[in-house]
Structure formats: structure tokens, C-alpha cells
């Protein structure tokens, strides 16, 4: 499979891969819901919906930063938005908004966050909300607050 497509720019699947590996995985680790949690507590998140924009094309070897620009949660769901910024030229290359569920992997069913995780997420919101971007959010109505 080619990382560069016939239009001579980065294939769309690699935008998603970068958001997943360098954005979502990082957030899940901060909130103690990542790979370690999946293996030890059998609880993790599963993405159920996403909305991605391709704002300016990237070339194959371009370096980018991925930043979380919005985050919220209810008792069972996470909503977050990330931006992909060209490292050198500082342009917005892409955004993704995610709706994910917290899942008990033994039961394969949605479950509620433990108090420890709620505390970590609320602290993250408190520390970062002044930098959040609230415009064009697609999934806010899906949180049950």
C-alpha cells in the first residue's frame, strides 16, 4: 500500500493513522485508558464516530504537530477534537473530532468511567479549557450530561 497517492500527496489513510497513533493513543495514556489499561484492567475506549477535515495537503515527509484542541466527557463517553499543524510552516493541515465509548473488554459492553479516571479527565479539562476551540463541534449533543 502506498503512503503517497496518485495525486502525489500523502494518502488520506495516513492522516487518520497519525491522529490515532500520536493523538488518541496519547490522550488514552494520559487518562489511563490506553494499551496498558486494556491489558491489565480489560477496559479501554473504542471510537464509534469521527469527523475529519483535510484543510491543506501534506507531502509525504512533512513533519506535523498534533494538538488536542477540545475535550469533554460524560459517564461513558469521550468527545475530543485534534488539529494537525505543519511543524515548519504552521498551517492547519487537518482536524478530527472523535466520539468514543469506554468499554469493558471482558463483556464487550459500554461501562462507566471509574472515579479516578473522571478526576484525571476533569483535571485535564480544567488545565486546558482556556485553549479549547468550541466552534464547529459535531458531537457535543451526543454526550449525556
Where are the regions that the model predicts?
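HotDog/MaoC-like acyl-thioester-processing domains
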Residues: 54, 58-63, 70-145
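Hot-dog-fold acyl-thioester-processing enzymes
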Residues: 2-47, 104-145
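A structural signal for short, hydrophobic beta-strand segments that form beta-sheets
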Residues: 47, 68-70
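Small beta-barrel nucleic-acid-binding modules, principally OB-folds
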Residues: 42-60
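Short, positively charged
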Residues: 35-36, 42-44, 62-64, 81-83
Amino acid at each position: 500500500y502506498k503512503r503517497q497517492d496518485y495525486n502525489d500527496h500523502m494518502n488520506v489513510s495516513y492522516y487518520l493513522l497519525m491522529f490515532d497513533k500520536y493523538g488518541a493513543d496519547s490522550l488514552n495514556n494520559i487518562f489511563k485508558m490506553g494499551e496498558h489499561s486494556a491489558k491489565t484492567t480489560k477496559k479501554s475506549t473504542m471510537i464509534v464516530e469521527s469527523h475529519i477535515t483535510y484543510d491543506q495537503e501534506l507531502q509525504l515527509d512533512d513533519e506535523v504537530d498534533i494538538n488536542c484542541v477540545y475535550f469533554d466527557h460524560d459517564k461513558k463517553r469521550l468527545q475530543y477534537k485534534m488539529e494537525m499543524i505543519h511543524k515548519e510552516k504552521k498551517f492547519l493541515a487537518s482536524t478530527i473530532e472523535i466520539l468514543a465509548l469506554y468499554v469493558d473488554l471482558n463483556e464487550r459492553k459500554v461501562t462507566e468511567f471509574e472515579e479516578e479516571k473522571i478526576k484525571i479527565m476533569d483535571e485535564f479539562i480544567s488545565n486546558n479549557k482556556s485553549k479549547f476551540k468550541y466552534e464547529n463541534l459535531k458531537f457535543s449533543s451526543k454526550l449525556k450530561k
